Amino acid sequence: MSIVKEAHNVKVLGSGEKTIVLGHGFGTDQSVWKHLVPYLIDEYRVVLYDNMGAGPTNPDYFDFHRYSSLEGYAYDLLSILEELEIKCCIYLGHSSSAMTGVVASIFRPDLFSKLILVSASPRFLNTDDYYGGFELEEIDQLCQAMESNYKAWIAGFAPLVVGGDMDSVAVQEFSRTLFNMRPDIALSVFRTVFTFDLRHFLSQVTVPCHIIQSSLDVAVPVAVSQYLHQNLGGMSIVEIISTEGADCFGSYRRGSEMETKRGSDDAVTIALR
């Protein structure tokens, strides 16, 4: 196995003609897609990977300087595509990985036929003329809480982001993947994600984008999805859904339902058409 495949725990499933690459968000790993993958493998070649710093990755490979910006993650994504000799793919990214796909598509637009951006935000911090959802003081307080007591921070952060109590499957899953991250790496990634400003990249995007946004997402206001739609350089559409919490956790909450039903109104299904 190559270094790239080993470092990112790359898995390739299915044998369809089209390739879809799934990128997970902060605090999770590729297991977040476990309820979605069974519905893709009959029609697509599905590529799963872990972002560097995620629990299943080797923390010794985490370069704090490289991953202090999303460009480092974008170059990792491009390396994976190159290693697998993927000439063109659909990229489905959640949260920070959605923006990783945006940046990677600017570097190599030929490798992407479509970007599906779930709970994407080019900037989480508010400015005088932009509403991202957070003030810098709030992010600083969250970082201080992480440094002070990482376990206690997870107990408060996971239910808030996912939307549910600690007994819910979705919250327990998110808590598990957060616990699997080394605390200092989790803090570094968190600070990078919640303080980046990628708005200047948007006009350079030429790949078609399908934006999926939950109306109840506590981390990304609906206004951000409209901002993306208005400022992306290429064609884009926005789909607002009513799933509570961060949208990638919908598969955990609806696990049994998704295993028995693939509704025509499923957001990802629609985006793949």
UniProtKB/Swiss-Prot annotation:
The keyword Secreted appears for this protein: no
Keywords assigned by UniProt, alphabetized: Cytoplasm, Hydrolase, Nucleus
Tissue: Expressed in stigma.
Location, primary (coarse class): nucleus
The EC number(s) this enzyme carries: 3.1.-.-
Known function: May be involved in plant olfaction during volatile communication.
Single Gene Ontology MF annotation: hydrolase activity
Gene: KAI2IB
Active-site residues annotated for this sequence: S95, D217
Xref: InterPro entries: AB_hydrolase_1 (IPR000073), AB_hydrolase_fold (IPR029058)
Family: Belongs to the AB hydrolase superfamily.
GO cellular component: cytoplasm; nucleus
Entry's localization field: Nucleus; Cytoplasm
Native organism: Petunia hybrida (Petunia)
Name of protein: Karrikin insensitive 2 receptor B
